[in-house]
Amino acid sequence: MASLDENADELHRMDSSDEASINDDQEDILDTPRTRVRKMLASVDMQLSSNAVSEASLDKESTVGNLENQKNRSYSSEIYLHSDTNFLSNFDSAYERVRRLLNQQGGKSSLQKKEVEQIETQEGGDNAKGSPSSENKDSDRNSRLQQLIEKKRNALKKEQEDLIQNSATSHSKSDNLDSESADDSDLADESELSKKYTSDRKIRNASKKALLELHRNTARLTRETALKPEVVVKKKVTLREFFQKIGFKNDNQLENKAISEEEANSTEPPNVEKEEPKPSVDRSTGIVNSEDIKELSVEDDSLELKEITPEALDIGQTSLFTTLNQTQVKKEDNKKFLLKEINAKLNEDDIDSELEIEVKPKTTALDNIEKSKLSEENEHGIKGKLKQLAEIKLSKDGKPFENEFNIKSFNRNLVKRAAVMAKLQRNQLEEELKAKGIYKPTIQGEKEEEEDPLERARNDAEKIRQLEKASGNASDEGELNDEEEVISSSNTPSTKAKTTNKVIISDVIIEATQAEPKRRQKNSRVVFDEEDLTGDSHGSSNMKISESDDESNGDMIRDSFDRLSSESIKDSQKTEELHDSFGINDEVDQSTSLYVQNSQPSASQLTIVDATYSQPPPRWESSSRDDKTNTSSTQPSQVDSLVPTQLDSTIPTQIDSVQRNKDQDDEEILEERRESRRDSKTFLSRTMLYNKDTGKADSAWASDLIEEQAIESDDEYAGIGGLSDDGLSDSDAELEVQNMIDDETTIQKGEVASMAQFAKDQEMDRDEKLVKQLMKDVTTGALRKRNRNGFAALDDSDDEDYSNLRREKLKELRRQKLLEDGNLNVLEGDKRKAFLATVEDSLVSSKDNLTWLDATVEDSGVGSSDLGDEYLYSEQSLNHEEEEQMEEELSEIFSSGGPNVVDRVYLKKSSTRHTSDNNSLEEVLPIFPGVRKLVSNSQSEKIGDLSNDNSMGAKSYKTPIISSTQRPQGRKFRGLMNQSSKADISRTVDAGSIKVVPNSQSANPPRLLASLNNYSDFD
């Protein structure tokens, strides 16, 4: 019975637990996934904390037995097994804990389902056998309950064992690999269980929040691991090994330094004693031997620091200098480094209360090295290096060559370099000009000039003009200037005339350097022959030069080149100086003129002057000329049309005989100049005359060509311009032209003056009217109101706007006059709409077209404004009954007018009553013009026949028609008002109101258009 009671209690407990689980499941359905996870974790933590001890002691013996069977199990793993659940619950992440719990629950539920299925199958089998008795049923129930309880307990025990084994195996893997073989069976069971769990339960996908939390945890773990990196030292490198690799110090020095460092780092610093011998110090390095350092000792209580040795201050300099100067520096054993005395002084001066540190000044190994005398070999080596830097060639013995410096080769090299530089500059300039489209090669330019004779003639004329200008600016000797001209050729005219007066230094130098230097040189003179002059009309005179063997020619060419380079910058010299270089000036001697002539290129060929050309001696007669010439020294060269690097031809004239012969007397200089002048006359005049004749022939040919072209052009247009000029003389043609041209006007001077006076008078009248109108507008306030919208700003278009405004006013007046006609009923109908529109929209250009608008006395008070026209009148005897009657009649008109008519009579009701009571304000009655087809003659007469008993007399009033845009307030009318025959109405301003005062005097009624000029105040 007791067992039955226990079974019943257990069943009741299970039922209650099932109900609680059902309720919990219902609550879990309503909860969010996050709250479910929190609840599960809280329940698991509570169970683990409460049952930790009982679960640990439940199967202690079995776990201990299993642990003994395992090999190489450490004590730390045993301790971990007792607290595995706590460790897992506290240190695992939330994701791992939830997954583990879900797996456990899934495993339990699957086991329970299997047990229930087995029981049902057994019951089904028992039922199939037959229906047992009641006692058998009770016994069967008890047995089933016991079996279920035992199975449950066994399952729980097995789960606990599995957890313990899993934790043990996970930790034992890192300690021992043999433990894995012992737990193969347990792992196999675990894998089978996990397979069952996964097959029975479907894994739910993690939510976004769970994934986000998982990523955060992983990021936190990675940050923590990154903050604590693991430092691994692969290999330690000592200072000695480092210096050995770079080969900086010897092994002995490194050993001594290592020992000194050990002593410095030791706890007991060395002490200094005066009685002991001085330690030996290596003079080259300044390092104290280790044995001597060990002997030093210092008291334990002293705070004195170790002496800072020169080695500590030296950063590798001592060893560097010692290795470089080992061969030159001699070691001296007598000099030693007194380390003990320095340390002793530091100890004596030390004070117990304060710490004083004295640092020895920095010294280097150079202070300890004595300067040794340089040997002759070293001295000779230094001199050799200096000579090598100066680019002085040395022989094998180290001595320079006998010919240290050759002036001829030096000058030749200098000239070559200058020629190359000039050539490069010229090429660069040619490329720039080609890129701009200005430069044309010589061959191309010649072809174009041959094809275009007009261009060629123009160039020839330009040359002639240049020559004439140069001849006019020459010196006082007229005969010489008339005969001598610039050497030029006619077969290759340049595209620019200025190029004929320039010297191409680069071509001269390049071709001068091409001469053979070893050839024996002779004195040369340029000789012109008649055959050379007359042989080729278009060819240039080939100058022949013979070489001289004077050794002083290098000095002359060097001096001339220096002068060329110094004077090349002066570009502002006039062109007249160009002709002084050709012998035109009297002060140029024979040799200078010859040198300049040889350096001056012709139009087609350039005659070469050798760089070794020497100056002819003074008093050199023409009889000593050598007709034998060396033709090999002349080399023709084509001259380009554009010369980039050009120097003024006046530069060679600086080589004057006075500068070259400073030691000579004045008489010799004058005599030499006379001879040179005589030679230049006989030498250059023939050439110049020949060139002058050829230039005249070219100019004559060009003029003939131009005349032929002009005749051809006249023939093309023959017969078009009337009679030909062949039958008329020059005088007849001039008379005819004079008759065609009339320089004087046919109008007489009096007529012109009268016309000018008339125009002037008109202009004066117009200006006077404008000024008067402006003054009137200023006095009446019209100018202020006119510029009201422009904020009192002056504008050029004010007058134009004002004229447009007056035009609109006239247009409105015309429309009102048309509406007053009684025959407007004829114009009713759709057929007349176009006509009415044209009448209404037509513009009135001037008031001359409105003469028919002139009104009588009845039209007094009609005005115009920018918002429309207004009809102003006043009645002193108008009572309220007449006013009401008139309002009723007007209301009938407005009611029949349609939606376009707006009744504003009632807006003015209060103002009209006020004016009728006071009898002081003018009354304004607005009637809109949109009802023109409804206003008939009878209605207008009915409305207009308003009588005035007092002052106005028996008088008929027209219908006051006012613009629809007029404001309902009272208008201020400052224009000229029409007056009746009995009374003259004038305006006076009294306290802001307008009074109408009758006058006994009568005046002629003004015309309507005249009154429009006085309308200046329009709101």
Curated annotation (Swiss-Prot):
<feature type="compositionally biased region" description="Polar residues">
    <location>
        <begin position="487"/>
        <end position="503"/>
    </location>
</feature>
<keyword id="KW-0235">DNA replication</keyword>
<feature type="compositionally biased region" description="Basic and acidic residues">
    <location>
        <begin position="556"/>
        <end position="580"/>
    </location>
</feature>
<feature type="compositionally biased region" description="Acidic residues">
    <location>
        <begin position="17"/>
        <end position="30"/>
    </location>
</feature>
<feature type="modified residue" description="Phosphothreonine">
    <location>
        <position position="645"/>
    </location>
</feature>
<dbReference type="InterPro" id="IPR018564">
    <property type="entry name" value="Repl_chkpnt_MRC1_dom"/>
</dbReference>
<keyword id="KW-0539">Nucleus</keyword>
<dbReference type="GO" id="GO:0031582">
    <property type="term" value="P:replication fork arrest at rDNA repeats"/>
</dbReference>
<comment type="subunit">
    <text>Interacts with cds1.</text>
</comment>
<dbReference type="GO" id="GO:0000785">
    <property type="term" value="C:chromatin"/>
</dbReference>
<feature type="region of interest" description="Disordered">
    <location>
        <begin position="105"/>
        <end position="143"/>
    </location>
</feature>
<dbReference type="GO" id="GO:1902975">
    <property type="term" value="P:mitotic DNA replication initiation"/>
</dbReference>
<dbReference type="GO" id="GO:0011000">
    <property type="term" value="P:replication fork arrest at mating type locus"/>
</dbReference>
<dbReference type="GO" id="GO:0062037">
    <property type="term" value="F:D-loop DNA binding"/>
</dbReference>
<dbReference type="GO" id="GO:0007095">
    <property type="term" value="P:mitotic G2 DNA damage checkpoint signaling"/>
</dbReference>
<feature type="compositionally biased region" description="Polar residues">
    <location>
        <begin position="590"/>
        <end position="607"/>
    </location>
</feature>
<feature type="compositionally biased region" description="Acidic residues">
    <location>
        <begin position="476"/>
        <end position="486"/>
    </location>
</feature>
<feature type="compositionally biased region" description="Basic and acidic residues">
    <location>
        <begin position="454"/>
        <end position="468"/>
    </location>
</feature>
<feature type="compositionally biased region" description="Polar residues">
    <location>
        <begin position="630"/>
        <end position="658"/>
    </location>
</feature>
<protein>
    <recommendedName>
        <fullName>Mediator of replication checkpoint protein 1</fullName>
    </recommendedName>
</protein>
<dbReference type="GO" id="GO:0000405">
    <property type="term" value="F:bubble DNA binding"/>
</dbReference>
<dbReference type="GO" id="GO:0033314">
    <property type="term" value="P:mitotic DNA replication checkpoint signaling"/>
</dbReference>
<feature type="compositionally biased region" description="Basic and acidic residues">
    <location>
        <begin position="271"/>
        <end position="281"/>
    </location>
</feature>
<dbReference type="GO" id="GO:0000403">
    <property type="term" value="F:Y-form DNA binding"/>
</dbReference>
<feature type="region of interest" description="Disordered">
    <location>
        <begin position="166"/>
        <end position="202"/>
    </location>
</feature>
<dbReference type="GO" id="GO:0031298">
    <property type="term" value="C:replication fork protection complex"/>
</dbReference>
<dbReference type="GO" id="GO:0003690">
    <property type="term" value="F:double-stranded DNA binding"/>
</dbReference>
<dbReference type="GO" id="GO:0031573">
    <property type="term" value="P:mitotic intra-S DNA damage checkpoint signaling"/>
</dbReference>
<dbReference type="GO" id="GO:0070337">
    <property type="term" value="F:3'-flap-structured DNA binding"/>
</dbReference>
<keyword id="KW-0597">Phosphoprotein</keyword>
<feature type="modified residue" description="Phosphoserine">
    <location>
        <position position="604"/>
    </location>
</feature>
<dbReference type="Pfam" id="PF09444">
    <property type="entry name" value="MRC1"/>
</dbReference>
<feature type="compositionally biased region" description="Acidic residues">
    <location>
        <begin position="177"/>
        <end position="191"/>
    </location>
</feature>
<dbReference type="GO" id="GO:0090001">
    <property type="term" value="P:replication fork arrest at tRNA locus"/>
</dbReference>
<dbReference type="GO" id="GO:0005634">
    <property type="term" value="C:nucleus"/>
</dbReference>
<feature type="region of interest" description="Disordered">
    <location>
        <begin position="965"/>
        <end position="1019"/>
    </location>
</feature>
<feature type="region of interest" description="Disordered">
    <location>
        <begin position="261"/>
        <end position="290"/>
    </location>
</feature>
<comment type="function">
    <text>Component of the replisome and is required for rad3-dependent activation of the checkpoint kinase cds1 in response to replication fork arrest. Phosphorylation allows it to mediate the activation of cds1.</text>
</comment>
<feature type="compositionally biased region" description="Basic and acidic residues">
    <location>
        <begin position="192"/>
        <end position="202"/>
    </location>
</feature>
<dbReference type="GO" id="GO:0035591">
    <property type="term" value="F:signaling adaptor activity"/>
</dbReference>
<feature type="region of interest" description="Disordered">
    <location>
        <begin position="443"/>
        <end position="683"/>
    </location>
</feature>
<dbReference type="InterPro" id="IPR024146">
    <property type="entry name" value="Claspin"/>
</dbReference>
